[in-house]
């Protein structure tokens, strides 16, 4: 038994991109949209997703997290590694770390050098970043003031460790920047976050859907698991999906287009299950081939990161807030006033550096955290501490996503192939050693205790490599598995249209040709804003005329205030 309905557009996935498209397309009178989301609602009374400081909670369990695992990663001691992905209205913007980082201007200028992607330069993209954003301190040439995404800048009076860590980075010889999303990304400075003025997570469900839900032309179905995209010949005409635990396939038809916004894991999986992908993969599973497209699921990229943890000699870290007896007061202050520790994701400082002159723009990212704990909330150090998250930005390693079954409830096979190049290993060795130099600068003298992790005995290349193999974790930035472009491995063109098919687009982080320098939520929203104008037949926003930093022949680093020698 099937039931059927018809809409202008069907959007698969109510995440960072899907919600953006749903809101923008329904701004046009009479345009009907069906938005399908495999997860549930974004319950506004659930502190796990709404309180910024509770960011570790939605990663635990499977209510809001698909909780994928990789195949054994061959260069990481064959570990099966986490691959968390958001499930529910908001997608990964419902469970992410809320770091608002756009990437480096050179990322987009690099995309624009590819044939067919000429209009993806930084100055073409910047107007769409601005369109999406409302920054709490007001708009300027780089930031918006009227968009659906609430962005909060760190305020005076926040934790002194943030300021000490930025100062230490500057004392180590690296630049200072007052805005990681402004004129110059390179350097250390305050980190913006997607949090509302009253201290709530600013997911795309809150920012975009709250307005769009008021329109009768938008239909949202939660707990709707997409089985496959329906085709007539080479034209996408609809979607078959399941609701809840039912095995009844419901069919919905799209008069204009099907818009796939499942993210870098689900989008290639859904394409392959629908008969679009490498023919040899589909044939093994007896999936009828609609279109042999070898790049679907290939080119998978991510950011890997390490934690360097230190004891804190003054009682200024967030360690007491991890204790259950302190949490009711923190929760009450957040609930009723929208302020306090609960209102921040606690990633309020960070930076981007070049580990050597070989890189034209930053290849290492830092997040600073005034507590020593794993990102997913596990293995908290039982004392006052602080840590730096450090990771490489544009690894040459490439992975893949492959469907394992026709069953939409079966997870795909995921392999990132982390650390498969010598460049990866050199960047992590350099990153750890540079971080140690930063941590030894005078600004941290009042706070710095012993090195908890990796530990001062971990010094040689071999020891550092072993530590990375055992302890590096994902930064939860999968991307690039349905890349834009014109070469034989490209899946979509510069407007997200799937090569060789009609009426089907992919719009999410999977279409990035190369991963950006930083967190992926802001770029994903920008991509959706930009392609929304294409779908609507609107003229693109005028190119920005803002200036932006290009390192050129400037050195990656100046002379440090305190010289640190590395033990052999």
Curated annotation (Swiss-Prot):
In the UniProt record, does the keyword NADP occur?
Answer: no
One GO cellular component term noted in the UniProt record for this chain: membrane
Q: What is its EC number?
A: 1.1.99.1, 1.2.1.8
**Pfam families of this UniProt entry?**
GMC_oxred_C (PF05199), GMC_oxred_N (PF00732)
Q: Where is the active site?
A: 477
Q: Listed GO molecular functions?
A: betaine-aldehyde dehydrogenase (NAD+) activity; choline dehydrogenase activity; flavin adenine dinucleotide binding
Please write the reaction equations for the catalytic activity of this protein.
Answer: choline + A = betaine aldehyde + AH2; betaine aldehyde + NAD(+) + H2O = glycine betaine + NADH + 2 H(+)
The pathway this protein participates in, as annotated, is: Amine and polyamine biosynthesis; betaine biosynthesis via choline pathway; betaine aldehyde from choline (cytochrome c reductase route): step 1/1
GO BP field: glycine betaine biosynthetic process from choline
Q: Which cofactor does it need?
A: FAD
> What residues does FAD bind to?
8-37
Which keywords fit this entry according to its UniProt record?
Answer: FAD, Flavoprotein, NAD, Oxidoreductase
Among NCBIfam families, the record links this protein to: betA, PRK02106.1
Tell me the function of this protein.
Involved in the biosynthesis of the osmoprotectant glycine betaine. Catalyzes the oxidation of choline to betaine aldehyde and betaine aldehyde to glycine betaine at the same rate.
Similarity section: Belongs to the GMC oxidoreductase family.
Under which name does UniProt file this protein?
Oxygen-dependent choline dehydrogenase
Species lineage, top-down? Bacteria, Pseudomonadati, Pseudomonadota, Gammaproteobacteria, Pseudomonadales
